[in-house]
Amino acid sequence: MTVTKMSWRPQYRCSKFRNVYGKVASRENCYDCIPITKNVHDNHFCAVNPKFLAIVTETAGGGSFLVIPLQQTGRIEPNYPKVCGHQGTVLDIKWNPFIENIIASCSEDTSVRIWEIPDGGLKRNMSEAVLELYGHSRRVGLIEWHPTAINILFSAGYDYKILIWNLDIGEAVKMIDCHRDVILCMSFNTDGSLLATTCKDKKLRVLEPRSGRVLQETACKTHKVTRVVFLGDMKRLFTTGVSKWNTRQMALWDQEDLSMPVTEEEIDGLSGLLFPFYDADTHMLYLAGKGDGNIRYYEITAEKPYLTYLMEFRSPAPQKGLGVMPKHGLDVSACEIFRFYKLITLKNQIEPISMIVPRRSENYQEDIYPMTSGTEPALRPEEWLRGVNKGPVLMSLKEGYRKENKAIFIAPVKEKKSLVVNGIDLLENVPPRTENELLRMFFRQQEEIRRLKEQLSQRDLLVRQLELELKNLRNSPKDS
C-alpha cells in the first residue's frame, strides 16, 4: 500500500464545519480551587456526563477524586467531600454510559472499584464502593466501558493483561493476554465487536475482545503509536505517536490491513502526548496536546485527502487532560457540537470549552445533529458474552435531553474473603509501590520471621521438658 504524505498547507473544501470555533466558558461558569492531581500518568484524570463532573485530586496517602454536580460552578471549598476509598493513587475514572450515577475507577492499589453517586452529589466523604474488583497483580492504568452492552467493563493493568468484568456477577469473565508490555490505550469500534490497543512494545493491535484473538498487528518503523481511536463505521483507525525523528505524528489506518498507514502527517516537534477525540456524528477529529493549550480539528472523509484541516483553537494555558461531554449533554440551541473540560493545573481550574457551528437561524439544525448514540443499552452482559453484536440504540437530540433513568445498578452480593495473620488481613494489604515501601515490608517480614523462630524454639524447649518429665514418671518406682 502506498503511503500518502500530506501537505502542511490547509486544504479548503466545501464543509459545513469549516467555521467551527471554540468558545471558553466565562469565569463564573468554570470550576475553581480544585487540587488537580500531579500524577504524570498519561490519562485525562477527568470524566463528565450531563449530571456530574469527576476530577482526580492530589492527596497524601491513598487516592481520591472529586464528584461535583455539573451546575455547581465557581469556587470549590477545600473540604468538599471526596470519593476516597482507594489505598493507592487513582489513575483513571470513567462514567457508566447507561447509568449516570455509576462511575468506575482504577488505581495503583491493583483494584477496580465501582461507585454509586447520589443525586445532588456527595454530602460527606465516600469510602465504601458498591463493588471492588481484584484480579490484576500490578497497578491498573486504564478502564473502558463497553459501548453497547451494559455492565461490561474492561481494565488494563501493568501486568500486561486486559480483564473483562461482568458487573452483574462482580467477577472477571475473560482475560486477554497477548500483550508483551504495558498497554497504553484501548478503543472500541461502534458496536464493540472490535478492540484496538496500543502498547509500549510499539505495536498496534486489533483484537476480537471476547476471545482475545489478534486479528491485525503491526509495528510500523516510521510511526511509534501511543494513542488509537476507531473512526466510527468507516473501518478506519486513527493513531497519534512520534516519528523516528521524535516529532509528533498522526496516521490513518485501514482496520483490515495494518501493514502500512493509509496516510500519515507530522504535526510539530513538541514532546507532549497527542490525545485524539473523534465525533462520529460530524466526522470531526480533534487533536489536543498534553502540556500545550491548542486544540486542532480536522474533518475525516472516506476519499482522499482523508484528513482535512479545519481550524485551531488556541489558548495560552497548558492542559493536563481533557474531559468530554457525551453528545446528549450538549446545548443544541447554541449549535454546540462538542464540549471539552480542560484541566489547568497552573490555576487549579477546570475550564469548559464549547465547539460551536455558527448559524443565524435559531431552529434545530438537523444537518449537524443526526441520530446519535443514546443512553439505552443494546445488550445485556450475558448476550454479549454469548457472541451477540448490536450497534448502539440511537436517539434524537431535537427535543433536548430528557432522560428517565430506568436502568439501575444492583451490586452482586459477594462473600467477603479474608486471610488474617497476626491481626493483619493479607488480602486487604496492597503491594508496595515504592522502594521505601518495599524495604519497610521486607523489614516487617524479617521481624515476623524472627518472632516465629523464637516461638518455635520456645515450643521445642517445652516439648523436650515435657518428654523428660514423662520419662521420669515412667522410670519412677510404683507405689506398692
Swiss-Prot record:
Gene3D superfamilies on file: YVTN repeat-like/Quinoprotein amine dehydrogenase
Keyword line: Actin-binding, Coiled coil, Cytoplasm, Cytoskeleton, Repeat, WD repeat
Tree of life domain: Eukaryota
InterPro entries: Coronin, DUF1899, WD40/YVTN_repeat-like_dom_sf, WD40_repeat_CS, WD40_repeat_dom_sf, WD40_rpt
A single MF term (Gene Ontology): actin binding
Record's keyword annotation contains Repeat: yes
Residue spans of the WD repeats: 85-125, 135-177, 179-217, 220-263, 265-308
GO CC, alphabetical: cytoplasm; cytoskeleton
Coiled coil (UniProt feature): 436-475
Subcellular location: Cytoplasm, Cytoskeleton
Principal subcellular localization: cytoplasm
Protein role: May play a role in the reorganization of neuronal actin structure.
Protein family membership: Belongs to the WD repeat coronin family.
PANTHER family reported in the protein's UniProt record: CORONIN, CORONIN-2B
Identification of the protein by name: Coronin-2B
Native source species: Xenopus tropicalis
